[in-house]
Amino acid sequence: MVYFYESKPTEYSTPYQIVMGKDKFENDLLIKWSYRELNYVWFHADKYSSGHVYLKLRPNEKTIDDIPQEVICDCLQLCKSESIQGNKMPQCTILITPWHNLRKNRYMNPGEVSFKSLRQCRKMECGARDNKILNRLAKTRVELFNNVEATLNEAKKTKNGDFFVNYIESNRSNLIEEEKLRKVAKKNQKKKNKQSKDEVTDDMQLEV
């Protein structure tokens, strides 16, 4: 699945879309099916495993130098929080590069990437975990669960830079409701499994 967040640090801030794969397999799909018109900048913890976080720049923005510092901080915090090692550290270095600078070949493991040019890579420091920022972002999260690769493929065919902005805006309510139903189903299944386990334990005790 793929997660979509909205970075809007203040009431009057211009909203930015942040995208992140749930795991290394979805991260590979984002690398494979993204396209230049999306204008993505990629964030990843330096020297540690972490989430692959993408920030969508606006059409008139070329680099992170054009982005409000508060929005960059949101991306840094989200990336650091999705690193097991980095999340425990008081400070963590984050690698930043445009999506089109990522290199992926068939010999690499899922989640592994290299770069076409190190000159296009930058590093920024992220401080200690900021729960205020992370809680704000979590409230905006929308989950694309079904037909992920097909949807990414459809987007790439259009070459529309605003495909996912429009998609999330049009389908937000349905996607949120679908996620709620999945959580309920998962909770019910967990209860059912526990009941089955308890019944087996009771049967074993009776046999003894």
Swiss-Prot record:
One of its GO terms (cellular component) is cytoplasm. Present with 3060 molecules/cell in log phase SD medium. It comes from Saccharomyces cerevisiae (strain ATCC 204508 / S288c). Keywords: Cytoplasm. This is Protein JLP2. Residues 185-208 are annotated as: Disordered. Belongs to the CCDC25 family. Residues 185-194 have a biased composition (Basic residues). It is found in: Cytoplasm. InterPro entries: Jlp2/Ccd25, NFACT_RNA-bd. It comes from the Eukaryota.
